């Protein structure tokens, strides 16, 4: 998709081991600009998840990702939002494969790398259609892409870092993915974060899910994961 020379130029901002990953990172970065350059998208969804943390809070991302996690800000039909997302991405990424589950809609865009060996890659856009609230509000953060292949910028609607980490804590408790622990460790040791607000956001999201978790229960849950090789084996993806 992207000329090799432009992929090489992108290495200064995307320090990944393979050209295919650099190419995919450029595609993901352009997708963010295209999405939030569309008012119909920017006004209706907020950016969340590990990609949001690494792309908007770190000068150099600490983890490779192929996912764009969005949250529908207000309750309402999801159809117009999906149409706006596709209007931003389909013209240059093609038609996505769409899946719908409980509380979420996923669109997967597939493409092949230009760099050899040619590899199939994907960008996954997932919209949470359930969490229609923000504990600490939504802020706008600038995001810039400056590449010979594509240049652009957008103000991206995103949760505050404490709320992003609070939802990461929820993810760490509810699933077995080492990247959740890695993201929390990196952010808490590298950024200025109010720990109490992180815990408060975690509790608020659990309440929204109808759950209550004690510290002892959380520690037992985490200790069980730390004994699992699959949890520890791939913490960065």
Model-derived features: positions:
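Glycine-rich beta-strand-to-loop/alpha-helix junction loops that act as flexible
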Residues: 47-52
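Structured mid-to-C-terminal alpha-helical surface segments
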Residues: 1-45, 56-64, 68, 72-237
């Amino acid at each position: 998709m992207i000329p090799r020379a432009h992929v090489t130029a992108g290495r200064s901002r995307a320090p990944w081991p393979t050209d295919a990953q650099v190419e995919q990172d450029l595609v993901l970065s352009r997708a963010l600009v295209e999405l939030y350059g569309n008012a119909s998208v920017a006004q209706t969804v907020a950016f969340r998840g590990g990609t949001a943390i690494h792309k908007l809070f770190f000068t150099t991302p600490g983890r490779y990702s192929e996912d764009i996690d969005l949250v529908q800000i207000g309750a309402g039909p999801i159809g117009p939002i999906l149409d706006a997302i596709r209007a931003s991405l389909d013209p240059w990424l093609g038609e996505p494969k769409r899946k719908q589950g409980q509380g979420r809609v996923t669109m997967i865009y597939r493409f092949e790398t230009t760099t050899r060996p040619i590899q199939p890659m994907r960008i996954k856009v997932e919209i949470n259609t359930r969490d229609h609230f923000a504990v600490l509000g939504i802020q706008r953060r600038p995001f810039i892409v400056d590449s010979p292949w594509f240049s652009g910028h957008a103000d991206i609607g995103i949760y505050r870092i404490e709320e992003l980490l609070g939802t990461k804590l929820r993810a760490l408790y509810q699933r077995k993915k080492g990247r959740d622990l890695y993201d929390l460790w990196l952010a808490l040791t590298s950024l200025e974060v109010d720990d109490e607000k992180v815990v408060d956001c975690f509790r608020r999201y659990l309440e929204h899910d109808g759950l209550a978790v004690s510290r002892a229960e959380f520690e037992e849950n985490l200790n069980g994961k730390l004994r699992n090789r699959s949890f520890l084996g791939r913490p960065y993806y």
